[in-house]
Amino acid sequence: MSCTRMIQVLDPRPLTSSVMPVDVAMRLCLAHSPPVKSFLGPYDEFQRRHFVNKLKPLKSCLNIKHKAKSQNDWKCSHNQAKKRVVFADSKGLSLTAIHVFSDLPEEPAWDLQFDLLDLNDISSALKHHEEKNLILDFPQPSTDYLSFRSHFQKNFVCLENCSLQERTVTGTVKVKNVSFEKKVQIRITFDSWKNYTDVDCVYMKNVYGGTDSDTFSFAIDLPPVIPTEQKIEFCISYHANGQVFWDNNDGQNYRIVHVQWKPDGVQTQMAPQDCAFHQTSPKTELESTIFGSPRLASGLFPEWQSWGRMENLASYR
């Protein structure tokens, strides 16, 4: 391309007859951008066709959706308060609470005096009630079968068992079958044998017994008031074939005694000086049971048998 053609492209105005290279340089410097752009136009089109598609940016694989909050959520988020832990001392308060208790006023001495008098009355009433308690002063005869059988064969009559429930004495008597006509009575006293009463026993049909013996039962109501100084004793009489056989517990009789409470809560027989009578013969010391003594066990639980002598037990018939 000649200098003249170059100047015509850059500036379409008419040229002089002679064009020098300096004129071309001046025209290039002073020319406007549109002619240059038109001159470089083919190169821009070539670049767009070959490079733009190759350098196209990749699409992101992350699909992020921006969901606008609803108006209600926006209100709740502003109204909801954040939870915080605040200590009392940071608010100027004390970490401890102090309660002051004043001493109770002392009760006057006269109140205590009346309380002691009331306690004395209660103790007296309790003692009076205790003196009315009664227990059997003998073990159940049938618990020692060998002794019971020997006594029965010798005397023809023997107390089999006895119980004391409230104010009633009940029990059974075993007699030897020596005749068809029989009469069995309980002779009992409540005033140390100054007076006594004979109570008839009732025949009981033998279900498991043999033909050599019969069984009778009795029930005796005790008086409502029995002085502690009086003896309560009974024995058994058996009338058959014009003869009278007795069971008086080997001369000691069967006794019912008054009891008192010990500090450990156990009932025991009242001392002789308290009951105003003494015993004519010494008592044999008996084995102790979990209830304190065999006599006590018979009084508290008369329907229970004591098995303190297992070596003497045998089948009863």
Swiss-Prot record:
Transmembrane segments: none
InterPro entries attached to this UniProt entry: CBM21_dom, CBM21_dom_sf, Pase-1_reg-su_3B/C/D_met, PP1_3C, PP1_regulatory_subunit_3
Short name of one Pfam family: CBM_21
CBM21 domain segment(s): 149-257
GO molecular function terms noted in the UniProt entry: glycogen binding; molecular adaptor activity; protein phosphatase 1 binding; protein phosphatase binding; protein serine/threonine phosphatase activity
Top-level taxon of origin: Eukaryota
Post-translation changes: Ubiquitinated by NHLRC1/malin in a EPM2A/laforin-dependent manner.
Chain residue ranges for the region called Interaction with EPM2A: 141-263
Listed GO CC annotations: cytosol; protein phosphatase type 1 complex
Keywords, in A-Z order: Carbohydrate metabolism, Glycogen metabolism, Ubl conjugation
One GO process term, biological-process aspect: glycogen biosynthetic process
Short sequence motif named PP1-binding motif, residue ranges: 84-87
UniProt key word Iron-sulfur: no
Function: Acts as a glycogen-targeting subunit for PP1 and regulates its activity. Activates glycogen synthase, reduces glycogen phosphorylase activity and limits glycogen breakdown. Dramatically increases basal and insulin-stimulated glycogen synthesis upon overexpression in a variety of cell types.
Annotated domain remarks: The N-terminal region is required for binding to PP1, the central region is required for binding to glycogen and the C-terminal region is required for binding to glycogen phosphorylase, glycogen synthase and phosphorylase kinase.
Subunit structure: Interacts with PPP1CC catalytic subunit of PP1 and associates with glycogen. Forms complexes with glycogen phosphorylase, glycogen synthase and phosphorylase kinase which is necessary for its regulation of PP1 activity. Also interacts with EPM2A/laforin.
Protein name: Protein phosphatase 1 regulatory subunit 3C
Source species of the chain: Homo sapiens (Human)
Gene encoding the protein: PPP1R3C
